[in-house]
């Protein structure tokens, strides 16, 4: 049944491709259609979610795709329009999707941040068919945008709500953002197809895992895809439809994550000169203002549906920034700045990226003189992007992140890899052009092939983990145990749970807390060790879950207080 639903979803999506192509009068490059479709759909779903019309909008978008497909078949009286998708770029795209489907098959969410927000918010949206509001007390990061969650909701709403399908939806969005790289390919397409596959594999392995709904990989892919769209369609001359598309990309970008605004700046630098030359400020205002208006609307929505949204962690409000900064002493601020700057300038991944780009630049200067200026522009832009994005990250640690997390630079490597992925995306453009455009001379071709193989080997051996994306990164034991006892003992949602960890797992309290909270949809969760058993007698909890082998002290406590439940991993605390 899932395959049938996926087939019909693909038909609807294909129909939307064609509607956008017709609306743009064939001016939109074909390789942008998958990502552009998502950008338009997310923009519509975002507005619909604000009006509490999420399922209605999902239905309209789905049916609109079938209408587009029907309209095209009737007009052309054939399926010849499919030929435009029969190229090596789309072949790579399909292979990426098939590999992604195999990678997520049978997987479950395991990483911490899935349970604290990213997977949690998608599950709640699917359950209630709306954006979260005051009734969703499980949602802690209330001002986090829902750009990625909105598309996963749309995909899962029609295909299936299982966790692997949610992962596949995110993988599809990432692959759709990678595909436009092929728009610059003119020759040697089989080799470029292989290069695109290799890059996609690296992208799914480098930062966040393909089995996560975290957006630190999606964000740079969408940001650079949107920039490439602006350069391709809006730099020299474009119509209102192209500007509308750029506006949708911009809305999608800033609604993925707050830091998406830093990837919006390059798009503005492309649009503003065009608006100045063509005296088209009115038409270009949509691209410049639409994402900012969407941010304002989102903040107004959060303030309306979450009474305390303005003071939650990472809320984009002056009051929250002021309170967070005032919570740090001058010495702590200085320590954070020193630690961050040291990391930003000495991070191994940064300098390996510099070496990689330098090797690629050497190849460009040696073999393809016309590309030299373009490569220099990319290099300068990459340096500027890294500087601006890292300054934004430093501001986040000072103004938005709690002191304890900021002092240990929580998540700094993941955030840095976000901007490095954007830089590597940009450098794939000259790499693909080298493969595509280098003159057919045996020596030059052999040199190009040899260097590119070396570059990719360097990329994988030094920047990636070389860990197969099919194996996963996290230990599933704890989640599998929780799911098994939930099913075996029929444990209900929303009750009060206590989880007892063995002493050697005491450092795992935080993960166990968010996992238990996610599993049982409960706000009343505490994680205990043997030393805390005495407090249970005065606690009004419902269930005690005992993880791992019971120690003699735990077994004795259970026999004393709950003799009829001795030896069980689940103790009903309401039964004496």
Go through the PLM ranges and name each one:
Residues 43-49, 241-258, 263-269:
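Membrane-interface alpha helices of multi-pass inner-membrane proteins
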